[in-house]
């Protein structure tokens, strides 16, 4: 018996990955829906399967923690802590179809301290081999840039270069950042 092939488009749904959202510990973050708010119905927000907002009403459990704007369907989470991280899903109807907007919230500490560690070795030709390490107070999602004079280079935590006596003193700055903050440290005695 011959069965004709079924079109691949039947019953196949593409899932949209969550949008990454970062919040500063102790701060607040607002999550918005992707569609035009005026056209939405049956709006709700959930976090990790727990209902926060349903039919434009905030759950008593979240009254002090969130602010919900029923006009534009934005959810603002206040006084962020590690407990607030998770997957937030806005569900709503538009044109008789259910839609969702999903966020993956990560709460991070601000960078509070940046220190440059220096290791200098004098070489036989009177030049110096310089190793600099940028130490930072927090450890996740960090990015680095270094400034040496007027040059910006390297996205590593550590840099290495050589100096000749004719180079004189130079100034080096490490800029460290994560999605919620940035700090820098300078060393002008290299």
What feature does the model see in each segment?
Residues 28, 61-109:
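Ligand-binding face of N-terminal immunoglobulin V-set domains in extracellular IgSF glycoproteins
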Residues 12-17, 109-120:
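Proline-enriched interdomain boundary motifs that mark the N-terminal boundary
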Residues 28-34, 123, 128-138:
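A short beta-strand segment in extracellular, disulfide-stabilized domains
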Residues 80, 157-171:
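Solvent-exposed segments in extracellular or luminal domains encompassing
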Residues 38-49, 62, 130, 136-150:
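Solvent-exposed loop segments of extracellular immunoglobulin-like
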Residues 1-27, 36-39, 44, 50, ...:
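N-terminal Sec-dependent signal peptide, specifically the hydrophobic helical h-region
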Residues 51-58, 62, 148-161:
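Surface-exposed, flexible coil segments in extracellular/virion-facing regions
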Residues 87-110, 152, 173-190:
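Extracellular/luminal immunoglobulin-like beta-sandwich modules
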């Amino acid at each position: 018996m011959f069965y004709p092939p079924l079109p691949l488009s039947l019953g196949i749904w593409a899932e949209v990955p969550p949008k990454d959202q970062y919040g500063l510990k102790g701060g607040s973050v607002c999550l918005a829906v992707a569609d035009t708010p005026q056209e939405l119905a049956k709006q709700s927000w959930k976090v990790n399967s727990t209902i926060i907002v349903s039919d434009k009403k905030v759950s008593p459990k979240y009254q002090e923690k969130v602010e919900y704007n029923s006009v534009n369907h934005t959810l603002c989470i206040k006084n962020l802590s590690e407990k607030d991280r998770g997957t937030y899903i806005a569900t709503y109807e538009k044109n008789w179809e259910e839609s969702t907007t999903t966020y993956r919230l990560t709460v991070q500490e601000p960078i509070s301290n940046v220190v440059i560690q220096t290791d200098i070795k004098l070489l036989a030709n009177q030049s110096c081999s310089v190793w600099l390490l940028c130490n930072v107070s927090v450890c996740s999602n960090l990015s680095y840039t270094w400034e040496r004079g007027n040059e910006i280079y390297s996205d590593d935590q550590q840099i290495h270069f050589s100096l000749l006596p004719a180079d004189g003193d130079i100034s080096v700055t490490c800029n460290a950042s994560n999605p919620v903050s940035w700090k820098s440290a300078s060393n002008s005695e290299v």
